[in-house]
C-alpha cells in the first residue's frame, strides 16, 4: 500500500483517459473538476475546506461582555448611591438582563445546542488528510487523476479515493465540473446513487472520498457479455429510473447517463456515479452542450433549451445499448452521428423483443414533450414483466423518495 500511496502523492506525469470510447465530446468528462480556486492563490483554496464560521460565535459573546463592563465602571455609581432608587432599578436590572440571556439561551434549547455541537464535531472530523487513509490498488485511471481502493485507518472503512490533479484541471479549464460533483453528489441519498462521503485537498491535488462499488462499471460487464438479456436490462432500467426520479425531484439533471458512469454495488445493484456534467438548475432549463456524443438528445445538438427530459432520451439510448451491444446512433464519423440523432434514425435488430422496442421508441422522440415520464417508464408492461429488483431495494427506493 505504501507504493500506491507514493504514486498517489507524486505529481501528475501522464494523463490516461478512463475509457477509450470513440464517441465523446472533446471536452473531457471522466472526472469532474474542482473549484476555480486552487493553485493561483493560497487563500482561494479555503473554499474547498469545511466552513470555519462557527468559531466566531464565542467572539460575539465576548463583545457583549466587553460592552457591559465599561457601563458598570462609569462614574455614575457615586451619585446613584445617594439616590437609592436609581442604582437599584436601572444599573442592576440592565446588568441582570444582559447577563441572564447568556446562560438561559443554551438551557432553553438544549437540543439545538447538542445538534450544533455535533455538527461542529462532524465538520472537524471531515477535515481529512491523506495520512488518514491506507491507499490500496488502483481502481481506474483518468485524464485528471486516478481512483484508488482505500481504507480509513481509524474505522477500517473501505472506500474509493479519487485523486485529481489541480494543474491538469486548470489547464483543461474544467474546474466547475468538480464543484458540481461536490455540491450535488454530496447532498444526494439514494441506494442507486454512489455516495460522496467527503473531500479534502492539498497544494497540488483534490481528493474525493467515494463509496466503493466492488463489482465495477457496467461498461466492463457489457464488454464481457457483448449484450444483456431482457431481465438484466429491465432491472437496470428500473433502478436507473428510480434514481433519476429522485434526482429530478431534487431538481438535478444528470445529462451524462452512459455505461461508463454506472457502477455496480456488492449486491449487483446499479449506482449512478460521476455527476460532473450534472446540474442543479432552479430554472430547470439549460442551453449548454455537454455529455457523451452517442447519448446527446436532439434538443442539445440543435442548441435548443432542454430540461430533465434529456435524461429520458439517454435512458432510451441506454436500454437499446444494453440489448444490442452498441448505441442506436453510432456511426463512423461525428457528423454522421449528429445527423442520425437530429433525424432520430435508428433500426432494431431481430434480437430486440417487441416490448422493448415499444419502450425505446417512446423514449427516443425528437420532441421532448412526447417522451414518457419516469413513472410511465416504471409502469411499462415490458419493464414490469422483466424487471427483478430485490424487495430491499424497492423499500429503500421508496423510503428515500418520500
From Swiss-Prot:
One of its GO terms (cellular component) is kinetochore. Residues 133-383 form the Protein kinase domain. One of its GO terms (molecular function) is protein serine kinase activity. The modification Phosphothreonine is found at residues 287-288. It is an enzyme of class 2 (transferase). CDD domains: STKc_Aurora-A. Activated by phosphorylation at Thr-288; this brings about a change in the conformation of the activation segment. Phosphorylation at Thr-288 varies during the cell cycle and is highest during M phase. Autophosphorylated at Thr-288 upon TPX2 binding. Thr-288 can be phosphorylated by several kinases, including PAK and PKA. Protein phosphatase type 1 (PP1) binds AURKA and inhibits its activity by dephosphorylating Thr-288 during mitosis. Phosphorylation at Ser-342 decreases the kinase activity. Gene3D superfamilies: Phosphorylase Kinase, domain 1 (3.30.200.20), Transferase(Phosphotransferase) domain 1 (1.10.510.10). It catalyses: L-seryl-[protein] + ATP = O-phospho-L-seryl-[protein] + ADP + H(+); L-threonyl-[protein] + ATP = O-phospho-L-threonyl-[protein] + ADP + H(+). Residues 1-126 are annotated as: Disordered. GO terms for biological process: cell division; cilium disassembly; meiotic spindle organization; mitotic centrosome separation; mitotic spindle organization; positive regulation of mitotic cell cycle; regulation of cytokinesis. Residues 110-126 have a biased composition (Basic and acidic residues). The keyword Ubl conjugation applies. The keyword Ion transport does not apply. The active site is at residue 256. Belongs to the protein kinase superfamily. Ser/Thr protein kinase family. Aurora subfamily. This is Aurora kinase A. It comes from Bos taurus (Bovine). The lineage of its organism: Eukaryota, Metazoa, Chordata, Craniata, Vertebrata.
